[in-house]
Curated annotation (Swiss-Prot):
Source lineage: Eukaryota, Metazoa, Chordata, Craniata, Vertebrata
Organism from which the protein derives: Homo sapiens (Human)
GO MF annotations, alphabetized: glucuronosyltransferase activity; UDP-glycosyltransferase activity
Cell compartment(s), UniProt: Membrane
GO cellular component, one term: UDP-N-acetylglucosamine transferase complex
Membrane protein topology class: Single-pass type I membrane protein
Thylakoid recorded as keyword: no
Gene that this polypeptide is encoded by: UGT3A1
List of glycosylated residues: N52
Cleaved signal peptide residues: 1-22
Domain of life the protein comes from: Eukaryota
Protein name: UDP-glucuronosyltransferase 3A1
Extracellular side: 23-483
Known role: UDP-glucuronosyltransferases catalyze phase II biotransformation reactions in which lipophilic substrates are conjugated with glucuronic acid to increase water solubility and enhance excretion. They are of major importance in the conjugation and subsequent elimination of potentially toxic xenobiotics and endogenous compounds.
Length: 523
């Protein structure tokens, strides 16, 4: 078995080395936070594989807060949106996060934020210097991100083939995958694949709500499309999603629910993983103080650190103070409540090497917001979780974590110090959580190809074959009435009704003939 895997790996990699040439690849990141980090990692991997990679990247402190900027192995084209655009984005993003933190419906705030992104995209497309430079480079392939609609429009403007990456689990975007509603949960439903009758009713109804939300978000770019594409050749965003040669998905079946896939869909969950390094000496010394009790890691992602309320910070601190473990917490010191004296077992830092700490043998628990990259890192290192999801895909991610027994989830707006303390102790002491997530880690590590190898292998494949037409079903080109057999249903229904009508007519004729025959007989 091991020999077969080695041969498969060697054959897969050699085919790329022998048949592919260095391609010019453009990656696009106009969003910040984890969206940027994922595209940065993709760019690094493709550059290391021998391709010539350039990232078109929107710079700004708001977009990449608390992220250590390192020298890039690939080329970067940086651009800045006007200051008034940046202020509007920050204002609407803050409003969106506050809406989520309050537990209110996020969709309206998200649509308003997308409208600002549409305006920003229009500005970028009007930058003749940037667009002409990109056209002159004549890239072989463009790499776009699912929620960055502007990146799809740039690829279309350049008239270049493109591949896309979905930074979340399936369901948060419709790009043509078959999704049976009986066991594939719709994105905002917070259901698992094990649905009872009422769960299936909810999932069915939420499908229409989700479709409407997608239409609302995509329509925020209508004005941008009208402004920058001539009438008669204006793209439709929902069609561009189907046009992608490949879809890479930042997930894995060790985490996600099993579901149907198409040939042009590739799982690369765990792509963010890098070689483990020793943790910084000051953190290692802090961990050593707690001996066998170990430590708890607390991290809430690149964007949420600056939006934690003072009240929530106090509740969390009170909960951590009651643990026998040490607690390493990424929390900006400038946001720390001045009236709170830090507990002796709690250490706050502005930045920490999350993956290295998750790999530390003394870690006992990961307290997280439930972001996709964070959850995948925890699973890879076999660390159980307590999730405090806030927005977007985080709630759905924690539904999967709970369903697979990798941890427990608490709504952030309902958390209390006592509840959080009891939940953390429960997950640390109940070894079933640790066993389940360690088993998931084995699933991730035992795959014949790593996420990075799958990424470069499939990129090389479509570069060599000139696209992925052979991987796309004809359904992408079918009218909806053909795809869902509406025409067949109407035909068969008409045929059935016509046959019934004809039979009825014939029976009527026979009945009248029989009645007439009886009358003749009587006379």
């Amino acid at each position: 078995m091991v020999g077969q895997r080695v041969l498969l790996l060697v054959a897969f990699l050699l085919s790329g080395v022998l048949l592919s040439e260095a391609a010019k690849i453009l990656t696009i990141s106009t969003l910040g936070g984890s969206h940027y980090l994922l595209l940065d990692r993709v760019s690094q991997i493709l550059q290391e594989h021998g391709h010539n990679v350039t990232m078109l990247h929107q710079s700004g402190k708001f977009l990449i807060p608390d992220i250590k900027e390192e020298e890039k192995s690939y080329q970067v084209i940086r651009w800045f949106s006007p200051e008034d655009h940046q202020k509007r984005i920050k204002k609407h993003f803050d409003s969106y996060i506050e809406t989520a933190l309050d537990g209110r419906k996020e969709s309206e705030a998200l649509v308003k934020l997308m409208e600002i992104f549409g305006t920003q995209c229009s500005y970028l497309l009007s930058r003749k210097d940037i667009m002409d430079s990109l056209k002159n480079e004549n890239y072989d392939l463009v790499f776009v991100e699912a929620f960055d609609f502007c990146s799809f429009l740039i690829a279309e403007k350049l008239v270049k083939p493109f591949v896309a990456i979905l930074p979340t689990t399936f369901g948060s975007l419709d790009f043509g995958l078959p999704s049976p509603l009986s066991y594939v949960p719709v994105f905002p439903s917070l259901l698992t694949d094990h649905m009872d009758f009422w769960g299936r009713v909810k999932n069915f109804l939420m499908f229409f709500s989700f479709s409407r939300s997608q239409w609302d978000m995509q329509s925020t770019f209508d004005n941008t499309i009208k402004e920058h594409f001539p009438e008669g050749s204006r793209p439709v965003l929902s069609h561009l999603l189907l046009k992608a040669e490949l879809w890479f998905v930042n997930s894995d079946f060790a985490f996600d629910f099993a579901r149907p896939l198409l040939p042009n869909t590739v799982y690369i969950g765990g792509l963010m993983e890098k070689p483990i390094k020793p943790v910084p000496q000051d953190l290692d010394n802090f961990i050593a103080n707690f001996g066998d009790a170990g430590f708890v890691l607390v991290a809430f992602g690149s964007m949420l650190n600056t939006h934690q309320s003072q009240e929530v910070l106090k509740k969390m601190h009170n909960a951590f103070a009651h643990l026998p473990q040490g607690v390493i917490w990424t929390c900006q010191s400038s946001h720390w409540p001045r009236d709170v004296h830090l507990a002796t077992n709690v250490k706050i830092v502005d930045w920490l090497p999350q993956s290295d700490l998750l790999a530390h043998p003394s870690i006992r628990l990961f307290v997280t917001h439930g972001g996709q990259n964070s959850v995948m890192e925890a699973i890879r290192h076999g660390v159980p979780m307590v999730g405090l999801p806030v927005n977007g895909d985080q709630h759905g991610n924690m539904v999967r974590v709970v369903a697979k027994n990798y941890g427990v989830s608490i709504r952030l707006n309902q958390v209390t110090a006592d509840t959080l303390t009891l939940t953390m102790k429960q997950v640390i002491e109940d070894k079933r959580y640790k066993s389940a997530v360690v088993a998931a880690s084995v699933i991730l590590h035992s795959q014949p190809l790593s996420p990075a190898q799958r990424l470069v292998g499939w990129i090389d494949h479509i570069l060599q074959t000139g696209g992925a037409t052979h991987l796309k079903p004809y359904a992408f080109q079918q009218p909806w009435h053909e795809q869902y057999l509406i025409d067949v249903f109407v035909f068969l229904l008409g045929l059935t009704l016509g046959t019934m009508w004809l039979c009825g007519k014939l029976l009527g004729v026979v009945a009248r003939w029989l009645r007439g025959a009886r009358k003749v007989k009587k006379t």
